[in-house]
Amino acid sequence: MKKILFILLLLVINAYSNELFTLPDESNFLKEKIRYEILSSKESIFIAMYNFSYKNIAKDLIKASKNGVKVTVVLDKSKVEANDKIYNFLKEANIKVIIPNDSKKMHLKTMIFDDKLALIGSLNFTKKSFENNHDLVYFTKDRKIIQKLKDIRAKFE
């Protein structure tokens, strides 16, 4: 009986460890989830985002940074122009922004919150992506996935 209860408990915990959002249908729910995770983070937030122009997310990252959270953003160099608004907005707020200087496209769309929760998907952080595109975003607490993402993060830092 104890074994069955333990297995059920693990299943319940696992059910809440993974969430899949489909866009554009669940766009508003996803925006709230991302905002909640950013503002609830205590230690660190890592983002690797191919295209990032959504200012509300940038504002939340700045709030988190001002609350002592280490925020690191990796952007693709082809998407960051000299006068890029989000890039400058984040840099002016002392957010660590990395632009890889290699020949490969930085096409990732991922986040890690406090090294405990990961976002993986096809979504760029643009208004168009949230409202007009068919995209998927998956949240997971799977340790193996998070470790792989941390290994990717280490390549950029």
How should each PLM-predicted stretch be described?
Residues 4-13:
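Sec-dependent N-terminal signal peptides
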Residues 15-17:
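Boundary at the C-terminal end of the N-terminal hydrophobic targeting segment
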Residues 24-30, 54:
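A general structural motif
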Residues 33, 37-43, 146-153:
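DNA replication sliding-clamp ring fold and its partner-interaction surfaces
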Residues 36-92:
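Primarily the HKD phosphodiesterase
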Residues 51-55, 77-81, 103-106, 117-118, ...:
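Solvent-exposed loop/turn segments at secondary-structure junctions
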Residues 81-112:
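Ligand-binding grooves and catalytic loops that recognize ribose/phosphate and carbohydrate rings
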Residues 117-157:
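Signature of lipid phosphatidyltransferase scaffolds
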